[in-house]
Amino acid sequence: MSKELAAMGPGASGDGVRTETAPHIALDSRVGLHAYDISVVVIYFVFVIAVGIWSSIRASRGTIGGYFLAGRSMSWWPIGASLMSSNVGSGLFIGLAGTGAAGGLAVGGFEWNATWLLLALGWVFVPVYIAAGVVTMPQYLKKRFGGQRIQVYMSVLSLILYIFTKISTDIFSGALFIQMALGWNLYLSTGILLVVTAVYTIAGGLMAVIYTDALQTVIMVGGALVLMFLGFQDVGWYPGLEQRYRQAIPNVTVPNTTCHLPRPDAFHILRDPVSGDIPWPGLIFGLTVLATWCWCTDQVIVQRSLSAKSLSHAKGGSVLGGYLKILPMFFIVMPGMISRALFPDEVGCVDPDVCQRICGARVGCSNIAYPKLVMALMPVGLRGLMIAVIMAALMSSLTSIFNSSSTLFTIDVWQRFRRKSTEQELMVVGRVFVVFLVVISILWIPIIQSSNSGQLFDYIQAVTSYLAPPITALFLLAIFCKRVTEPGAFWGLVFGLGVGLLRMILEFSYPAPACGEVDRRPAVLKDFHYLYFAILLCGLTAIVIVIVSLCTTPIPEEQLTRLTWWTRNCPLSELEKEAHESTPEISERPAGECPAGGGAAENSSLGQEQPEAPSRSWGKLLWSWFCGLSGTPEQALSPAEKAALEQKLTSIEEEPLWRHVCNINAVLLLAINIFLWGYFA
């Protein structure tokens, strides 16, 4: 969606720019910042740290299941809140509001599309993942196809995407807001956020991440709704927004161009399939390809659903997340449009010199739409609340990325080199990798600082658009087509990556022209929208996967037990044999997964008493607790206990009452979603 920031946003060319001196309208956001605002921010940090400590103490942190999947004991409401906050980072507040300011409502369709895919996650994908007994998505592909090359490929690709797109986006956007609002040093503010974020991520694992995400979701939604009402009140509610947005033209413009004019279709989601900036077939079908990767196969999102205590709780989390994803259109996109309506000379600037003075970017200043609205409209105290909202968005998305990246590295990469690694070794490695990510994040700050904001968002969206469709095609075929084989899956991925990289190289070689410039890009770029390309790439990858699979030996039926949609309910006995043979990291490790609400301590306390541990210093005890290291040796489970544990962890049975409750809520959610699409179409 943020790709449209550059395409739709006000740009400027050096040719033909009027030379009269524009009024100095630099955004002095720090005016009026009060001690009460700082107090609110401090209180926010205290609450987050308190919740992080509470959940870290409560969590089972000494096992793979406890640290990476919260002991598979999470309820539906924190899962739903975490699904929301993991996706709505500070980058979404800045980028979504900025794109709304530049182009109107259409970008909100990206959020409403997520509702459908969240339900697909809970009803289609998660049942297969739980039945397969996996912790990571590459691990599922290894179980499904065998071999290691697909697992390693997916793990490395995901880590690269997390480090160089998601982390950079959130840090850039959060730092932009904090600098404008507080005037803090960039390194100091970002460093404090990263350290606080990393501490409770390392100490508490996924349970700490999910509970703090739930707190931050409440803060985000509450604060954003307050700003939304203040903004609508200022412009005269929705009719006033329609009138004032269409008149939001800056005083200094580029002659003989229309870049400074608001789009005539700004208040419509579904736009012309040929000339629209976000064509409706691409928004409905092409976006679904990208959203399937994001919501149904991406480790950051799926890991939250896998932590559910039952399939019904996973479904309930998807429903709650779907309801929450309806809101960003109203409390992010529309406030971005309100900001342009109120401040057309700043948010809607097109003169590159004026834009440079306002926000430091010559391509336009739509990125400042949300922070500008906060600093202009929010009263003392509430302004601090909104600063806390952006911090919450930044920290919640970073914790999600940190924990999921740690999971991928530990399970899919480290164990390739250390096959005999112990449970405690994996716990330490997972925590050390989070520290590594924090260091990389801090080193990435100067690169973000020197990057043009529009180009950065353009780059991130391009990377996602050209790498995600092959992954979507692979997972869909892996789950629904039993005939797909490992060679077909691998060579399909390689083909899709090659085609995607080719398009990406062309995109960067021929950047979109600024306002007033002649478009010299080849037709395949300027006339073939990236959402259309996503549909084509997904289809071509699927064709290659199927053709190569049909030319190779099919996978025996018995090896697909509980690994596809059609075999997810097969008896557990076959799964246990296969699990013991192919995934020793889960089934052969006694404390590898702990029952819902339980942990290593409970397992070790069963049976005979443990010998008294030798006394240790407070420093060593604190370090052992921080790293999740048990002071007493784990007691091995008997074969019968292992089988019972495996059955519980891979069960997709549901109580009829709660299954019906989830189904009814899903239908209601879809009805609301369809109504909104129709109303704003």
From Swiss-Prot:
Q: For bias kind Basic and acidic residues, which ranges apply?
A: 579-591
Enzymatic reactions: D-mannose(out) + n Na(+)(out) = D-mannose(in) + n Na(+)(in)
Q: Where are the transmembrane segments?
A: 37-57, 76-98, 115-135, 158-178, 191-211, 218-238, 276-296, 318-338, 384-406, 428-448, 460-480, 488-508, 531-551, 661-681
Q: Where in the cell is it found?
A: Cell membrane
Q: One cellular component GO annotation, for this chain's record?
A: extracellular exosome
Residue ranges in the Extracellular topological domain are: 1-36, 99-114, 179-190, 239-275, 339-383, 449-459, 509-530
Isomerase is among the record's keywords:
no
Residues annotated as glycosylated are N251
Concerning InterPro entries, the annotation shows: Na/Glc_symporter_sf, Na/solute_symporter, Na/solute_symporter_CS
Q: How does it sit in the membrane?
A: Multi-pass membrane protein
Which BP terms from GO are recorded? Answer: hexose transmembrane transport
Q: Name one Pfam family in it.
A: SSF
Q: Which residues lie on this side of the membrane: Cytoplasmic?
A: 58-75, 136-157, 212-217, 297-317, 407-427, 481-487, 552-660
Residues covered by region (Disordered): 579-614
Q: Name one GO molecular function term.
A: low-affinity D-glucose:sodium symporter activity
Phosphoserine PTM sites in chain numbering: S604, S605
Q: What is its main location?
A: membrane
PANTHER family given for it? SODIUM_GLUCOSE COTRANSPORTER 4, SOLUTE CARRIER FAMILY 5
Q: Which family does it belong to?
A: Belongs to the sodium:solute symporter (SSF) (TC 2.A.21) family.
* Annotated protein name in UniProt: Sodium/glucose cotransporter 4
**Which species is this record about?**
Homo sapiens (Human)
Q: Please name the taxonomic classification of the source.
A: Eukaryota, Metazoa, Chordata, Craniata, Vertebrata
